[in-house]
Structures are given as C-alpha cells and as structure tokens.
C-alpha cells in the first residue's frame, strides 16, 4: 500500500463535494425529525447540525484528528445549518422527496463510513477496529439524533433496511482493498458496497434475522 498517499489523503482533497451532499442530507433528516417532534427553530437547527457532523466528529476523535474537521472547515457547519433551515422552511415539500433524500443519505453514509475506515487504517488499527470505527463514523450522527429526540436509535430496529450493517461492510471492504489499491480506490470500492447493500435492502431482498421470545 502507498503509505504516503494514505497519510496525506483527506476528504477535502478527495470527494469534498460529495461529502457536503452527505452533510446536507444528514442535516435534513435530523431537522425533519425535529419538525415532526414540533421542536422550535433553534431545536431544529441543533438537531440537524448534530446529525450532520456527529459521525464526522466521532471519526475524527477515533483517528486522533483534533479539532474535528467541521470546526477546522466551517463549510461543513454552514452546509448543515442550510440543510436544517431548508427542512424547517419546506418540511412538507421535502417529505415528498423521501426517495431522493434517502439516496443522498446513503451517499453520506457510504462516504463517512469509508473515510472513517481509512482514518482507522492510517493509525494502525486492526480489522475489527477499522470496521467499528467506520460503522460509528457512518451511523453516529443518526444515533445522536435519535437520542436527543427521545427515540430508540433507528439503526437498532430497522431490519428492513440495512444501515449500520452496510456501513460496517463498507468499512471492512476498505480494509481488504487498502493494501492493494490507492486510498481513493479503496474508499470508492467500499462506498459502492454500502450503496449496493442499501439498494438491495430497500427492495427487501436482504434482511437480518430477528429473534422473537414468547410473551
């Protein structure tokens, strides 16, 4: 593996624009939940921003990048606030484009999960550490969102749509590909796997088993 490329590779130098699309989508998803919960404008903005940058903050904390990227590059925060404002202002209209928002959300999940995996590889974590770091990077914002909104984290019970599982699989793919390809190629391969798993699960072709105990 090209250690120099891995050391110098950052999201800002790679798919920065796609990263911001993911931030925008995550912010909208968080803000829409706040609107449904009848939060005021401040609450909606906070929930949207936390959802958008929470996963990235976890990623940066796990990989030793301080302060987090969203504080070093305020474009992320401005994008998150824009997404939250759009959701607050046009919540009913945006809800009609659920499939489009889901596509952006999946893109953000794929990018955050795989970038978290790359960061974990850079600091020398093993395969399980890479998978765990990547998964938390992808789903961390959503977990924080649901806890703030007093909801059971959606990733824990939505078996009809692979989400955390897709993030973990994408991170694992990055670990497998990184020794043989450039960081960009490894991330692209992992991201494509995340998108594929999200696609097949939305069509209910793949589900995780659920254990039911007698009442």
Swiss-Prot record:
Membrane protein topology class: Multi-pass membrane protein
Compartments, record wording: Cell membrane
Coiled-coil ranges (or none): none
Pfam families: Gly_transporter
GO cellular component: plasma membrane
Key words of the record: Cell membrane, Membrane, Transmembrane, Transmembrane helix
Residue spans crossing the bilayer: 15-35, 39-59, 75-95, 101-121, 123-143, 162-182
Main location: membrane
InterPro entries the record matches: Gly_transporter
Family as reported in the entry's similarity comment: Belongs to the UPF0126 family.
Name of the protein in question: UPF0126 membrane protein DR_2368
Native species: Deinococcus radiodurans (strain ATCC 13939 / DSM 20539 / JCM 16871 / CCUG 27074 / LMG 4051 / NBRC 15346 / NCIMB 9279 / VKM B-1422 / R1)
